[in-house]
Design a protein with these regions (language model features):
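N-terminal beta1-alpha1-beta2 submodule of the flavodoxin-like/Rossmannoid cofactor-binding fold
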Residues: 1-104
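Short, acidic/small-residue loops that bind anionic groups at enzyme active sites
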Residues: 101-113
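Residue-level detector of conserved catalytic or cofactor/ligand-binding positions
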Residues: 112-122
Length: 122
């Protein structure tokens, strides 16, 4: 099983990365392979609604980190998205990233529930 952890912070090794690394370590203790994917610090455009991803192109017409993620995500069993919180919401780049990834990724990005282990009660 593989879980892709997405760092939506413009700071590759900041607080969001630390939180994702902690989550990754817990998953790895359960035998889950993890990979942290940083969206980077370059601007990420929002969806322009052209529909190219649905009309045979098979990916977003805006060629950036979103297409790279969708390819990796198609092979993953689950995702964890981490983002700094700005004014009670995720950052703009992360919002645009997720909108485009889930739309252009189509069925490969559909919700798939996974179960890792039984919770323990104390």
């Amino acid at each position: 099983m593989t879980v892709l952890l997405v760092n939506g912070s413009p700071h590759e090794h900041g607080c969001t990365d630390a939180a994702l690394k902690h989550a990754a370590s817990v998953l790895e203790e359960q035998g889950v392979h993890t990979e942290i994917f940083w969206i980077g610090s370059k601007p990420i455009s929002g969806c322009i609604g052209c529909g190219a991803c649905k009309k045979g192109l098979g990916k977003c017409c805006i060629d950036d980190v979103v297409n790279e993620f969708v390819l990796k995500a198609a092979e993953a069993d689950g995702y964890i998205f981490g983002s700094p919180v700005h004014y009670a919401a995720i950052g703009g780049a992360m919002g645009a990233f997720m909108d485009r990834a889930f739309y252009s990724g189509g069925k490969s990005m559909a919700l798939s529930l996974i179960h890792i282990s039984e919770p323990t009660r104390h």
